[in-house]
Curated annotation (Swiss-Prot):
Compartments reported by the entry: Cytoplasm; Dynein axonemal particle
Gene: dnaaf3
Gene Ontology biological process terms in this record: axonemal dynein complex assembly; motile cilium assembly
Protein family (similarity comment): Belongs to the DNAAF3 family.
Presence of the UniProt keyword Transmembrane helix in the record: no
UniProtKB keywords: Cilium biogenesis/degradation, Cytoplasm
Protein name (record): Dynein axonemal assembly factor 3
Record bears the keyword Cytoplasm: yes
A single Gene Ontology CC term: dynein axonemal particle
Free-text function comment from the UniProt entry: Required for the assembly of axonemal inner and outer dynein arms. Involved in preassembly of dyneins into complexes before their transport into cilia.
Length: 485
């Protein structure tokens, strides 16, 4: 069941739980047992299957809330395309304020994060960034110069070559190479089968009986149904969304009449939605208010506010305050029906985009916001079964996170790499639409056994109806296994 929850479902382009500031979820015993480097406590975090980078981003953006620590992230993903997206989202979050405004940056992030189709302006940005990433993965010295917070030294040469190919694919302007609207509809038809002709009812059922019942009531039917139909979740400005988002392309071995063939397509989620990651929780409780039992704000609006807040805090080190009505967040989401997705681009928008493109050419690139005391290490997928064999990681990780799609890889050997009193965070399947309630409930027992097998215990009761993560602590009686140096 743990494996079935996510094994080869395709890449987890967005997670099945809201973004976490991982320092919030570090148990007190973990914090008390941190070791220091250069006078700073060091928090070593292993992320296995984080997927969309939401936990990484939120933890980095909110680091100024905590006592000064050195944060070291070690990331293992199921697909190299996910590491490529990590690089994109990190570089976007760290764009210098003089290079890109807060509102524009936040809208661009959500568009690339959760949309199958993007604006031509956004596609141009992606192509430009792809050039940078190609240089980074092919020239380590250049990468350390422009993105010193990122460490790719553990990535194998073959994986570097594959990352280069991914970025080269992103760089190609031809939309015909990735007809995601066709892929999306095809996957929808296969998923729904005979229900396809009455799919609006299926969408409403999943939203009401799964997402709403499990606590994601802020997602409204209009935005959810539109995403289920088109794959477009965030449309924060008037614009034409007609360019395939190539960052959602990946390859999978698919059985065909001629045998198994490596095929590029869209292999990700079409039921849970990108809204869960950033759009169903917020510190600004006024955004969760209801009127006559209906949420006043949409998941899109909440997601935009949350991303603006995170990026503001990253740039300034200060918690974001909601501006007075009519100021900075005036350009929030309009009803989905007002959006244009093809063919009806206005002359005014064309003029605006040309002017913005010209401004971009004339502006001098300012580089990235400096990340102090943060290291991000990409690790090969094969290492998920080899970390305990590498002496450098013995008793090393203070916090370990496994997504629901990769928790089946949590083995007893992980007690070797967990530091004293380490925290283990496991994603649950509460918001996984494709699972019935009995499967969501039984999943808790399964992952608890996996955690216990790896030497972790918990005194916290886990309620499958309300919790979307489970926390465990490394037990004192954990037995060290023999490791190879």
């Amino acid at each position: 069941m743990a494996a079935a929850a996510g094994r080869r479902m395709g890449p987890s382009w967005w997670g099945f739980s809201p973004a976490l500031d991982l320092q919030v979820h570090c148990l007190q015993g973990t914090i008390q047992h941190l070791t220091s480097s250069d006078g700073l406590p060091e928090l070593n975090i292993l992320l296995v299957g984080g997927g969309d980078g939401r936990h990484l981003l939120k933890t980095i953006c909110q680091a100024s809330r905590w006592p000064h620590r050195k944060l070291k992230f070690f990331i293992i993903e199921s697909d190299l395309e996910l590491l490529a997206r990590h690089m994109l989202f990190l570089s976007l979050a760290l764009e210098h304020p003089e290079q890109m405004g807060l509102q524009e940056k936040s809208e661009l992030f959500l568009e690339l994060f959760g949309n199958s189709l993007i604006r031509s302006k956004t596609a141009n940005y992606l192509q430009e960034k792809s050039e940078l990433f190609i240089q980074c993965v092919t020239d380590p010295d250049y990468q350390q110069c422009v993105m010193p917070f990122l460490n790719l030294s553990s990535i194998k040469f073959k994986e570097r070559d594959e990352l280069e190919d991914i970025f080269k694919f992103w760089r190609i302007a031809d939309p015909k190479l990735f007809p995601i609207d066709k892929y999306w509809d095809g996957k929808n038809r296969r998923h729904l089968g005979t229900r396809y002709d009455s799919r609006k009812g299926a969408y409403d059922w999943d939203l009401s009986m799964k997402l709403h019942d499990r606590g994601a009531g802020v997602i409204n039917s209009r935005e959810y149904n539109y995403w289920r139909e088109k794959g477009v979740a965030f449309m924060n400005r008037e614009g034409v969304y007609d360019v395939p988002n190539k960052t959602l392309a990946s390859q999978m071995v698919v059985p065909q009449s001629s045998g198994k063939v490596l095929t590029r397509g869209y292999w990700g989620d079409i039921t849970t939605s990108p809204y869960v990651a950033f759009g169903i929780e917020t510190e600004e409780k006024s955004l969760l208010e209801t009127a006559n039992g209906v949420h006043v704000k949409s998941a899109q609006e909440i997601a935009l506010h949350n991303i603006i807040s995170l990026f503001h805090e990253l740039a300034t080190g200060k918690v974001y305050s909601v501006p007075a009505s009519g100021q900075a967040e005036a350009e929030l989401v309009k009803p989905v029906g007002d959006y244009k997705t093809n063919g009806d681009q206005t002359a005014a928008e064309t003029i605006e985009e040309k002017a913005e493109a010209e401004d971009t050419k004339q502006s001098k690139y300012k580089g990235f916001i400096t990340l102090n005391n943060v290291e991000i290490h990409f690790l090969p997928l094969s290492w998920v079964n080899e970390l305990h064999c590498k002496g450098r990681f013995t008793n090393f990780f203070n916090l370990l996170y496994f997504s629901s799609s990769m928790v089946h890889l949590l083995k007893p050997e992980y007690k070797v790499i967990a530091a004293s009193k380490a925290t283990l965070v496991l994603e649950l399947t509460k918001f996984m639409v494709d699972l019935q309630a009995d499967k969501v409930q039984s999943y808790v027992s399964i992952v608890t056994k996996l955690a216990q097998g790896a030497g972790f215990t918990s005194d916290e009761p886990i309620d499958w109806k309300t919790h979307y993560i489970a926390r465990f602590e490394r037990g004192d009686d954990s037995v060290e296994l023999q490791t190879a140096q």
